[in-house]
Amino acid sequence: MTRIIVVGPLKSPYIIDGVKQYLKWIKKFERIELIQLPLSGDLNKTPPSIYKDKDFKKFEKYFPDSFNVLLDERGEQMDSVKFSEFYDRTKTSSQGKHINFIVGGPLGHSDKIYNKADYILSLSKMTFTHEFAVLILLEQLFRVNKILHNETYHY
């Protein structure tokens, strides 16, 4: 199963609506679980490195028996066809394992997580909020499934 694990709740109504819609469309092909982890305290009172390390500890429990893809603007970029090939190859070679897409919180990722990730993927060189990253990732996973099932993707 594929999981999207994100620090911080999805709050914006238009993002929530989009996420629900893509999860509904994707359900035709596969089940994707969205896991929203709570924020690690007050951003204004906690030093960034401690905050990020707390986020890392929340992610860490999902690492065993999983292929962990870290979303980060410094990761590898690919077009939708290459992403579909990567996703298909990863699902095939990771039988019985979860594929985790890890979306960081407001301060980004702890340095510790980069060594634990199996792959680092960039949605763009630009930085997105965690909400937009989740929505963009879901759109791409829907597109991937359309590509892998030889279906067109047009509106």
From Swiss-Prot:
Protein name (database record): Ribosomal RNA large subunit methyltransferase H
Keyword Iron-sulfur belongs to the record: no
GO MF, one example: rRNA (pseudouridine-N3-)-methyltransferase activity
Summary of subunit composition and partner proteins: Homodimer.
Keywords (A to Z) from UniProt: Cytoplasm, Methyltransferase, rRNA processing, S-adenosyl-L-methionine, Transferase
The family this protein is said to belong to: Belongs to the RNA methyltransferase RlmH family.
InterPro entries, alphabetized: Alpha/beta_knot_MTases, RlmH-like, tRNA_m1G_MTases_N
Gene coding for it: rlmH
UniProt lineage: Bacteria, Thermotogati, Thermotogota, Thermotogae, Petrotogales
One of the Pfam families matching this protein, by short name: SPOUT_MTase
EC id: 2.1.1.177
Major location category of this protein: cytoplasm
Entry binding sites for S-adenosyl-L-methionine: 71, 104, 123-128
Function, in words: Specifically methylates the pseudouridine at position 1915 (m3Psi1915) in 23S rRNA.
Catalyzed chemical reaction(s): pseudouridine(1915) in 23S rRNA + S-adenosyl-L-methionine = N(3)-methylpseudouridine(1915) in 23S rRNA + S-adenosyl-L-homocysteine + H(+)
Species, as recorded: Petrotoga mobilis (strain DSM 10674 / SJ95)
Location in the cell: Cytoplasm
Any one GO cellular component localisation term in the record: cytoplasm
